[in-house]
């Protein structure tokens, strides 16, 4: 990461050409830049229409200029935003003018958010939530990201850290001043009862992490069945485009194909797999192996059965959770007792019902779930280590209190690593590299 003393600039809006582009500037030279480019510093947080000029007083463009003085800005530094016409030529001219000013340079990925973190405007969970909000494609992803970026999840972790700090303070006070009247007598029982409750709270919270990961990364639905059961046809029908090759030749699908769907606000990752059968062809054998791997990782299996020649591979009947879908409804009489649903990809019959069924299954899984849940592996890892330290502190009742208190300190440190309250330098490059240049 380059020096935070530099003044940086970048395009913060979408790639040109566009109707409007927003260029953000942050750093100690922001006021000087505004004087050079637009003649003076606009009133704080008020929109001002200005002509932007080069150092030779040649006009670049006219647009809206805003100034946000430190510390009341996104980065905590002096920040300016220039809203100009979004042509490549205008942006190139403005960037050339900015780059000519000593001490001013183009920002690197995530540098504005990095400065916001360094200046205490955002913690790491809020930074990650902001990245997720920018990348959100479904309604549930948006809700999860808003909760995280607004500090809802951080507030939970901060409250837990405060409970750990208070517990350590009370135990250490009893250790240091056992004879003092103003130290509550025998606080241990109350402290450890609260730590047991905290351990339970964190355990319940960690158990919800899989839901957070599914909302963020997608609910995996695997289409499986015997060869020619209509798996690829269903993938194409649900995707509303030709993703998979469809032929009457058994074994056409040799690999796992995937498309993303938005069903009722949830990201659904839909996988088409090779037909499950004993194969002699090495390529098809590999496809079958990959299909079985996908089945193991599935959140839901759509078990397709060709109703004109019903055949279910033996190991698929035990797939759980699964929905049995009868296919080729247009070619045979419906056997409603055997199937959860019957469809025809040729006529579209049953496809809206299948989409609703998938949506209902996902909705039931997340019904009543708070969005203040962990959604990243690093959150889970730190929470698990926090729990492990609490387990040691709670279980080792026969050891010195100082040793048990040390485990509380370790537990608090792992909570602090989630929000960045403790040293997490090695994580920062990874986290901020997820952002675009202008964020």
UniProtKB/Swiss-Prot annotation:
Domain TrmE-type G, chain residue ranges per copy: 218-363
Gene3D superfamilies: P-loop containing nucleotide triphosphate hydrolases, Probable tRNA modification gtpase trme, domain 1, tRNA modification GTPase MnmE domain 2
Database matches in InterPro entries: G_TrmE, GTP-bd, GTP-bd_TrmE_N, GTPase_MnmE, MnmE_dom2, MnmE_helical, P-loop_NTPase, Small_GTP-bd
UniProt entry keywords in alphabetical sequence: Cytoplasm, GTP-binding, Hydrolase, Magnesium, Metal-binding, Nucleotide-binding, Potassium, tRNA processing
Binding site for K(+): 228, 247, 249, 252
Main location: cytoplasm
Enzyme Commission number(s) from the entry: 3.6.-.-
CC annotations in GO: cytoplasm
Binding site for Mg(2+): 232, 253
Family stated for the protein in its record: Belongs to the TRAFAC class TrmE-Era-EngA-EngB-Septin-like GTPase superfamily. TrmE GTPase family.
Quaternary assembly: Homodimer. Heterotetramer of two MnmE and two MnmG subunits.
Protein name: tRNA modification GTPase MnmE
Species for this entry: Rhizobium johnstonii (strain DSM 114642 / LMG 32736 / 3841)
Gene: mnmE
């Amino acid at each position: 990461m380059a020096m935070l003393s530099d003044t940086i600039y970048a395009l913060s809006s979408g790639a040109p050409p566009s109707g409007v582009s927003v260029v953000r500037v942050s750093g100690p030279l922001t006021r000087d830049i505004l004087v050079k480019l637009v003649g003076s510093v606009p009133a704080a947080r008020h929109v001002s229409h200005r002509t932007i000029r080069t150092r030779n007083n040649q006009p670049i463009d006219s647009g809206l200029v805003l100034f946000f003085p430190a510390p009341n800005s996104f980065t905590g530094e002096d920040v300016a935003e220039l809203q100009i016409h979004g042509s490549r030529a205008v942006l190139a001219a403005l960037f050339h003018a900015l780059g000519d000013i000593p001490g001013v340079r183009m920002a690197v990925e995530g540098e504005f958010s990095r400065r916001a973190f360094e200046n205490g405007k955002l913690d790491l969970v809020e930074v990650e939530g902001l990245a997720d909000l920018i990348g959100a494609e479904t309604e549930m992803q948006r809700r999860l990201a808003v909760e995280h970026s607004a500090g809802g999840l951080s507030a939970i972790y901060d409250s837990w850290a405060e409970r750990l700090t208070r517990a350590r303070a009370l135990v250490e006070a009893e250790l240091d001043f056992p004879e003092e009247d103003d130290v509550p007598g025998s606080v241990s029982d109350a402290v450890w009862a609260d730590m047991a409750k905290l351990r339970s709270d964190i355990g319940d919270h960690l158990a919800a992490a899989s839901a957070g990961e599914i909302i963020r990364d997608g609910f995996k639905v695997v289409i499986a069945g015997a060869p020619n059961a209509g798996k690829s046809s269903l993938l194409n029908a649900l995707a509303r485009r030709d993703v998979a090759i469809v032929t009457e030749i058994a074994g056409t699908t040799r690999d796992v194909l995937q498309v993303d769907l938005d069903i009722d606000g949830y990201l659904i990752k839909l996988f088409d797999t090779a037909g499950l059968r004993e194969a002699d062809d090495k390529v098809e054998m590999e496809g079958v192996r990959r299909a079985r791997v996908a089945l193991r990782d599935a959140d839901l299996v759509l078990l397709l059965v060709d109703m004109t020649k019903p055949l279910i591979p033996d190991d698929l009947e035990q797939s759980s959770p699964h929905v049995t879908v009868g296919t080729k409804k247009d070619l045979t009489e419906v056997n409603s007792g055997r199937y959860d649903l019957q469809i025809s990809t040729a006529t579209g019959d049953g496809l809206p019902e299948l989409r609703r069924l998938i949506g209902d299954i996902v909705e039931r899984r997340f019904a009543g779930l708070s969005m203040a849940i962990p959604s990243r592996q690093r959150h889970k890892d730190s929470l698990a280590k926090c729990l492990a330290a609490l387990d040691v502190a709670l279980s080792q009742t026969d050891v010195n209190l100082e040793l048990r208190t040390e485990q509380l300190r370790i537990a608090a440190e792992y909570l602090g690593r989630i929000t960045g309250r403790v040293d997490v330098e090695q994580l920062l490059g990874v986290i901020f590299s997820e952002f675009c240049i202008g964020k």
